[in-house]
Amino acid sequence: MSSEYRRNGKPDVTERVGDVVAQKLRHLEVLLVQPWSVTANRGNGFDLAEPAVLQIPNPSSYMIQKLLIHDRRKPAERAKDVLYIHDTIELFSDSLPALRRIWTDSISPALSSAARRTVSGAAEEIFGAVNDTIREAALIAATRPLDPIRIQEVCSAGLDELLRPA
């Protein structure tokens, strides 16, 4: 029988399969919904003998998974996740209507009603107002001037657009 915690009370976050130790990822199934295919080859900077087609999570799945795991993350990891969500929204801002369709047509129906409530609640809890996690995210982005208010506004507006009903 598997437990979320080890005998010493610490979270059990790894699993051994043969000689490989891997980190357990929560809500991994969300990352597998409508993955995007990209080709890695010499032409785009990968020193491969043959091109390799890779599947990567679509941006909607990526942000939803970050919202689902937020409460279980350490504070420093939460700040990194906030910055990842911010950067993903900025990078794909022109595609938010298409990303919303992925959410409404594929991701949301695959989640339990409790998970859907967690997503919407986490978006409001994390980005409803500037907080210490958002301030820490701004500090992490030290090489570029990011204001906590700007992070909060971008994430709140972007997630509102992503999660609003079709």
Regions found by a protein language model. Name each.
Residues 1-166:
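Compositionally biased terminal segments of proteins
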